[in-house]
Design a protein with these regions (language model features):
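Short glycine/threonine-rich loop-to-helix capping motif typified by GTGT followed
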Residues: 86-90, 133, 213-217
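Hard-cation-handling environments
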Residues: 99-178, 193-196
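Redox- and metal-dependent alpha/beta enzyme cores, enriched for Fe-S-associated oxidoreductases
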Residues: 164-217
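Phenylalanine-focused residue identity feature
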Residues: 39, 82, 120, 139-142, ...
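Conserved AdoMet/S-adenosylmethionine-binding subsite of the radical SAM
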Residues: 1-114, 138, 146-159
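A structural preference for short, hydrophobic beta-strand core positions in alpha/beta folds
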Residues: 41, 74, 121, 203-205
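Short, conserved secondary-structure transition motifs
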Residues: 79-83, 125-130, 211-215
Length: 218
C-alpha cells in the first residue's frame, strides 16, 4: 500500500490539499497500523509549506507508527506552466540540501535503532543539490523507485550489467533523447554503450514543451 502523506500537522494539510475539512491523517494511518497493514509513504515537499518544522513533525509522527511504515520518500514539488494558483517557492539547491540533511539524519536514526534506513530522498534532490547519488545498497528493495527514488542508480546498474549482451552495431548512429536533469549524467553511460557496441551515440536534450521548462526530469 502506498499513501500520499505530504504532511501530518492538520493546519499544513488544509493548505496543501486546499481542503478545510481534511481528515486527520495520523488517525487514519494509526488505524491501518492497528489493523496490521503496512504501507509506504510519499511526501511532496513544498518549500515554506511542509518543510522545516512541519516536516520534522511529520517524520516524527510516522516514526511513532513503528514497523507499519515501511519507507517514506521525500520528493520536491513540481511546478508546471499550468500551476497558476501556486505562489509558493520552487525547490532550489539550498532547499534540496536542507531536505537531504533531514533525510540522512532520520535514515541514520532508523539504521541505528531499527536496522532500516526507511527515509529516502528522490534522485531529483541529489541532482538539484549536486550531491553524488547513493549506490545500489542504499536503496534496499527499491520500493520507492516509482517515486523517483533510486531510478538513476538502477539505470546505471542495468546498463553496466547488460553491456555484455549487446550486439555489435559498428557504424550505426543512434540518438538518445532525455530531459534536462539527466543530461549531465548520460555521457558516462553513452561511453559505455559506444565501447560495447561500436555505435555512435548522440545525446539529445529536450525541454518539456507540455508542462514547461521547469519540468526537467525525463
Amino acid at each position: 500500500l502506498y499513501v500520499s502523506v505530504h504532511a501530518t500537522p492538520w493546519e499544513a494539510r488544509k493548505v496543501l490539499l486546499n481542503n478545510p475539512r481534511v481528515p486527520n491523517i495520523v488517525d487514519q494511518l494509526t488505524r491501518l497500523a492497528e489493523g496490521g497493514i503496512q504501507f509506504h509513504g510519499q511526501m511532496v515537499i513544498v518549500p515554506g509549506l511542509n518543510d522545516g518544522e512541519v516536516l520534522e513533525q511529520s517524520l516524527a509522527d510516522l516514526w511513532n507508527l513503528g514497523d507499519a511504515v515501511m519507507s517514506v520518500a521525500l520528493v520536491p514539488v513540481g511546478v508546471t506552466q499550468f500551476s497558476h494558483l501556486y505562489n509558493g517557492q520552487s525547490m532550489d539547491a539550498v532547499n534540496a540540501r536542507l531536505l537531504l540533511d533531514t533525510v540522512h539524519r532520520w535514515a541514520e536514526r532508523g539504521l541505528a535503532e531499527r536496522g532500516d534506513r526507511w527515509v529516502f530522498g528522490s534522485d531529483e534532490l541529489y541532482l538539484l543539490s549536486d550531491e553524488p547519488l547513493p549506490g545500489m545498497e542504499h536503496y534496499g528493495d527499491f520500493s520507492q523507485i516509482e517515486n523517483g527514488v533510486g531510478a538513476v542508480t538502477s539505470l546505471r546498474s542495468r546498463v553496466r550489467d547488460g553491456l555484455s549482451q549487446l550486439p555489435r552495431l559498428d557504424g550505426k548512429k543512434i540518438g538518445i533523447v532525455t530531459g534536462v536533469s539527466m543530461t549531465p549524467l548520460m555521457p558516462e553511460l553513452l561511453d559505455l554503450l559506444r565501447d560495447a557496441t561500436g555505435a555512435e551515440f548522440s545525446l539529445i536534450t529536450m525541454e518539456n514543451s507540455l508542462f514547461g521548462p521547469t519540468t526537467t526530469t525525463a
